[in-house]
């Protein structure tokens, strides 16, 4: 009887620590292969679309400027296009830099 009373707090602790299915994936940081695995899990047979920018495009704003067809002083339209491109949120920004939910991942399914 005394042994059972000693294990009662441990049993209560284990019950409280049990993960609940609905809370197992609320919001998480997902990067690299973890992000791809989560997309496979969420999208299943539908598949998903993901076109990452190259490191050069991310690090060098002049590359994006040249791709828009201009150089320095090309005009306000080019400046506006660059600003919109910077504000555009991709899946990496949503899930790796910030946190995302399964519902946000579903937006990237086909």
Curated annotation (Swiss-Prot):
SMART domains named among the record's database cross-references: IlGF (SM00078)
Gene Ontology cellular component annotations, sorted alphabetically: cytoplasm; cytosol; extracellular space; nucleus; secretory granule; sno(s)RNA-containing ribonucleoprotein complex
SUPFAM superfamilies: Insulin-like
Keyword Cytoplasm among record annotations: no
Disulfide pattern: 31-96, 43-109, 95-100
Domain of life: Eukaryota
Family: Belongs to the insulin family.
Protein's recorded name: Insulin-2
